[in-house]
Amino acid sequence: MTGNLVIIAAAAVLSCACVFVLIRRAAQLGLVQAPEARSSHVRPTPTGGGIGIVAGALVAGLSLPGTDGISFLILALGLVIALVGLIDDRRPLPARVRLPVQALVVAALLWSTGAAGALAGGLPPVFHLGAAVLLLIGVLWWINLFNFMDGIDGIAGQQAILMLLSAMLIAFGTVPGVTGGWTWWMMAATAAATFGFLVFNWPPARIFMGDAGSTFLGFTLFASAMLSLVAGWLSLPQWLVLAALFAGDATVTLLVRLLRGENVAQAHR
């Protein structure tokens, strides 16, 4: 366990170091975000700080004991999500490019982990396809939700840490031997890497996650949920409760704007 704790601490330090460098090199890398309607900042602010989260989490994930084929696949899929986000940070990609890639990544995760079958197992076969489509849409919404909320100082990082630590504590208190597996420690590593970034994202934020970090974090949270569901650690209702406040806030906001006849595709504060 001591070795795992060292890896977790290293994830936080690596993330913090990456963000520190990015703040100073953001202009050279084309990673500066001008103030916009949805953001809480009033002057150009570096973005792409989520690269630190990605680096810390991936290095830790590869270093933790118990890494297997599924673990490697999840890390690789997370890297794909992050790379698409990084490209979008530097040169905005249209939704018709981003969403299909994200959908393929999510589909690969659901298929490889067996999560789709676990979630639809109680439904009659005739409903399986419809349930899969709804699940895919919901996951895409969840992944992009983190990007949607990244404009508010600290909120996305705090939510991710809260969800991960809460899930870890629930599993620790109810599942014997849960700390012997890769998934539990990977959740800890992701939380630690997020904390390393949050040091610089705390109000007033010196840097934002950007698409690279926010979409990676949304995907990693979903992957953690799927792995824990398949393993029987946590139930779907428990994860929905953990995500309810964050997802509900953004969803209700968009619904209210839609009912008012506003353009929900246009950013707002």
Task: List each language-model region with its residue ranges.
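Membrane-proximal soluble regions of multi-pass membrane proteins
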Residues: L242-R269
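"…together with the soluble PPM/PP2C metallo-phosphatase catalytic core" -> "…together
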Residues: T2-T251
